[in-house]
């Protein structure tokens, strides 16, 4: 038992580029991150996420503060760095800090205030009272939105969802398209190492619009319970 993520290999017979998806959870056991990085950076190109902004530093306290929990004993995902012998080209497939800040300013003030207050409280709750089991239950994700996700929709949070999810989905798909549409790139194997919640957009692009098919799936253990 524990939390797992699915490593997916996709292929379109009409194109040379094979794609591997690594849906990420940003907290896990060291072995999980080591395996993912070693595998991903054996590809020709790696698309990665990361918004460098003081805003994201504040709102990611909800999981970053788990690092202090002796009960959970998990580590945070480290910065992307290729192994010494890797020749992979790293592509930043995310918003810049300035772009994210511009979208964040469109979020209603009371929603921003709530996020700023709630994030550290959630982080402290995880640190002091959380268990691996409770954290795993809160991070299950299917290919399609669940009933609970649909029911949680609120007009007040549209701008928040746009900043945190949708705008970043668009940028990721744009960067993916640039790689796939470049006939002279010489790329044969492409990896996407990105938050699990963003992989739905990638799968829609690859399966529905570009004719890719899942060739192989493999479970990776983020952490055991």
Where do the model's predicted regions map?
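Conserved, well-ordered alpha-helix/loop/beta-strand core segments that scaffold catalytic motifs
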Residues: 166-167, 173, 179-183, 190, ...
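Structured, acidic catalytic/metal-binding patches in enzyme active sites
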Residues: 1-167, 178, 182, 214-223
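A cross-kingdom marker for long, charged
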Residues: 186-225
């Amino acid at each position: 038992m524990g939390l797992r993520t699915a490593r997916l290999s996709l292929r379109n017979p009409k194109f040379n580029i094979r794609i591997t998806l690594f849906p990420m959870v940003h907290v896990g056991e060291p072995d999980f991150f080591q395996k993912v990085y070693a595998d991903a950076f054996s590809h020709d190109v790696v698309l990665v996420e990361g918004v460098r902004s003081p805003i994201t530093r504040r709102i990611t306290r909800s999981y970053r503060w788990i690092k202090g929990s002796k009960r959970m004993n998990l580590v945070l995902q480290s910065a992307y760095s290729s192994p010494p012998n890797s020749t992979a080209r790293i592509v930043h497939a995310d918003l810049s800090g300035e772009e994210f800040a511009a979208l964040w300013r469109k979020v209603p003030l009371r929603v921003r205030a709530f996020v700023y207050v709630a994030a550290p409280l959630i982080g402290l709750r995880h640190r002091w009272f959380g268990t691996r089991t409770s954290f795993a239950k809160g991070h299950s994700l299917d290919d399609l939105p669940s009933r609970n996700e649909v029911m949680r929709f609120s007009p007040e949070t549209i701008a928040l969802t746009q900043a945190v999810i949708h705008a970043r989905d668009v940028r990721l798909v744009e960067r993916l398209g640039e790689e796939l549409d470049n006939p002279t790139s010489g790329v044969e194997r492409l990896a996407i190492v990105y938050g699990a919640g963003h992989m739905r957009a990638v799968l829609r692009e690859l399966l529905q619009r570009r004719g890719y098919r899942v060739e192989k799936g493999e479970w990776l253990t983020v952490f055991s319970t």
